[in-house]
Amino acid sequence: MRNNFFLLCLIFQGVIAQERDALLEGLFEDEMSIEQQVLPQKMIFTQSVLWGKNGLFRKTGISKLSIAQRQKELKVRNVMLKTHQIIGYLTLAGMVAQGIMGGRLYNGDYKLYDTHKTMGEWVTASYFTGAGLSLFAPPPLVRKKIKGLNSIKAHKWLAYIHFSGMIATNAWSKEDRDWHKYAAYTTFASYATAILVFKF
């Protein structure tokens, strides 16, 4: 009888322990759903590395994942993307000036070479600063999937072209004048179009 009572107590303890474990698991599942609510399902690689669930800022404790912290991150995102936009306009103006000077250089006005070179360095720096602000900004709460072509998709596709073009323009600046010119025109056209698609 005593052995039966001991066995019954042991079984009862096992049942209580399982219920307690199930309750704790439920709590952790709720925490996971909070993480899923504050981070989008998909992020670009650069955002994931910094701002993802296991990103650098989470691991180092710079930006712990919570609803309050995500609200702060969204404010940072807003500032970064507005700055990206302003730098984008300045870069476009610099590209126009570069195109004018470049055309004069091709027509034999070599006194503009140093100015063109210096302006090219400034345009390159502003371009990659603006790109960095976009690529490293905290992710949005939700990434909306929109079927078909829209201004955001067009802006991103054009970014592949002008990003590659900017690298090619700089790579060919001393190597091949013709390819430098073609890369610069391609970069300018795709960059200007990427800005215009957001306006219309």
Give names to the regions the model predicted.
Residues 6-7, 24, 33, 119, ...:
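Low-complexity, compositionally biased segments
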Residues 2-3, 9, 25, 42, ...:
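Generic intrinsically disordered, low-complexity segments enriched for polar/acidic and small residues
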Residues 146-154:
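Juxtamembrane helix-capping/reentrant segments at transmembrane boundaries
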Residues 77-106, 115-138, 153-174, 180-200:
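Hydrophobic alpha-helical membrane-anchor/signal-helix detector
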Residues 15-114, 133-147:
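N-terminal targeting leaders of membrane proteins
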Residues 1-19:
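Bacterial Sec-dependent N-terminal signal peptides
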